[in-house]
Swiss-Prot record:
It comes from Thermosynechococcus vestitus (strain NIES-2133 / IAM M-273 / BP-1). Its main location: cytoplasm. This is Proline--tRNA ligase. SUPFAM superfamilies: Class II aaRS ABD-related, Class II aaRS and biotin synthetases, YbaK/ProRS associated domain. InterPro entries: aa-tRNA-synt_IIb, aa-tRNA-synth_II, aa-tRNA-synth_II/BPL/LPL, Anticodon-bd, Anticodon-bd_dom_sf, Pro-tRNA-ligase_IIa, Pro-tRNA-synth_IIa_bac-type, Pro-tRNA-Synthase_IIa_type1. Catalyzes the attachment of proline to tRNA(Pro) in a two-step reaction: proline is first activated by ATP to form Pro-AMP and then transferred to the acceptor end of tRNA(Pro). As ProRS can inadvertently accommodate and process non-cognate amino acids such as alanine and cysteine, to avoid such errors it has two additional distinct editing activities against alanine. One activity is designated as 'pretransfer' editing and involves the tRNA(Pro)-independent hydrolysis of activated Ala-AMP. Homodimer. One of its GO terms (cellular component) is cytosol. It catalyses: tRNA(Pro) + L-proline + ATP = L-prolyl-tRNA(Pro) + AMP + diphosphate. It holds the Pfam family tRNA-synt_2b. Consists of three domains: the N-terminal catalytic domain, the editing domain and the C-terminal anticodon-binding domain. It comes from the Bacteria. Keywords: Aminoacyl-tRNA synthetase, ATP-binding, Cytoplasm, Ligase, Nucleotide-binding, Protein biosynthesis.
Amino acid sequence: MRLSQMLFVTLRDEPAEAEIPSHKLLLRAGYIRRIASGIYSYLPLMWRVLQKVSAIVREEMNRSGALECLLPQLQPAELWQESGRWDTYTKAEGIMFSLTDRAQRQLGLGPTHEEVITALAKDLIRSYRQLPVHLYQIQTKFRDEIRPRFGLMRGREFIMKDGYSFHADVASLKETYQVMYDTYSRILQRCGLTFRAVEADSGAIGGSGSHEFMVLAAAGEDEVLYTADGQYAANVEKAVSLPPDAVPTTYKTVATLDTPNAATIDALVEQLQCHPTQIVKNVLYRAVFDNGRVGLVLVSIRGDQEVNSVKLHNTLTSLAPNYGATKLLDLRLADAHTAQEWAATPIPFGYIGPDLEDAVIKADSQIIPQWIRIADRTVVELKRFITGANRDQQHRVGVNWGKSCPLPAIIADVRKAQAGDRACHDPTQHLEAARGIEIGHIFQLGTKYSEAMKATYTNEQGEEVPLVMGCYGIGISRLAQAAVEQHHDAQGIVWPLAIAPYQVIIVVPNIGDAQQMQAATDLYEQLQAAGIEVLLDDRDERAGVKFKDADLIGIPYRLVTGRAIANGEVELIIRATGAKSTLPLTEVVRYLQKEIAQQLAP
């Protein structure tokens, strides 16, 4: 392609809307343009990148035995109501674009396709002889993000590969799950990305187990915790660990002390000259279940630890049937302002104990009249600890679990693991932290959707049983931007060869020089004939502008038909390293063919 014939516009200044390097560079280099918040046009260079990523994904999915199809973007609400996710996606999380057609039927623009594919399986799969089967698609998805940001990382419209497998049993599911784990690893390796597969929370998708594939980058939204021995890695939402041992207190008896202005752990530690591991802090939440009932949650956790909201959400979801509900719609931290909605008397925030009375909860038919009390495992073994006295400006010391302060009946891991914690599999190993961008997510769904939607098959014994499912997603557009986030420098993008829009760019410093132009044109035609993807910068621009643009757009190999042409040579610059050399014109094609073949070899 000749750059003079391409719609190619670069920006010298960083766009004000962009926050992270990859977003800035994709805008500056003319790869994408913003149409509205979270909505982007993919310009010709970007479309070539996306096609290359899609091709790698498609090759590896086909290699795994999966079958490509295309599912509708517009989905009827009935399917989502059947699975029980309509309210979750349109009200609780609110991420689905929904609409009503002229016949007053509710529809949604698909953020994911579990319901559609399960309905298809229900209609098409009858016997165990048809199993296992794995279908996938590559298409545009939609999410009504509250705050779209970071360009293609968190947009309202994006390209994704999603696949769904159906099985006769869990053993078969696990086989395909491992195949997909290996497939995703190969995809990211072929795309030239450094990544880590980590244990993850299944979120609204559900299921018994899942892994995320994280591309490591400083600007990643997710925190990954891992051990140096390579035996453990997890998203911080899912991670488990052993916290530091608690320091014993010196208190012998229970006493109530005045602790003015000690509503925070730091202030209390300073005032009592104690250690945060000796404190039981108590955190309040307001939970809303899908039947409209409101639960007030009191979490007791060690003073040096933080509550993991995802783990707490999952714990409360498992408790939902106790309150006539099936799921949790909303969970928010309570404070003095929001407490006015449900508190019968003022709540002494900062001085709350695990035994705060139920009587402080306002009488209301929609509000559960008792605290949902949850103790994190870090507090269970504490003795003679410090905690709130349930009175403003006062704390109790020397407290033990028992009659005076009952241990909550619900004990769960709701703490946030952190770097420095000991690993569960080997306490001599300590967790380390890294930032990551979630590119892929694979799930063992089990029978969650098939049971809800009555998608069954007849097994070998002639029994009608639910299909066992797995699902597997990888973000195509997100992967492309993540590659830029991981591969860039001060001059611009440094594309991995496998997904670069072009493999070679030829720069003509002076198009008025007939010898330079003729050499460039000859090379251009020879490289094209050899099957090498080449871009010819034949614009009427200054040489400095062309060199800066070549660095900015990140093409892996640059050929310059400058002064060396007089000696029958061309300058070669490798974008990733900046290494420069000269090659005889007669050797250029052969050299690049060999280099590119070696880099793209499996």
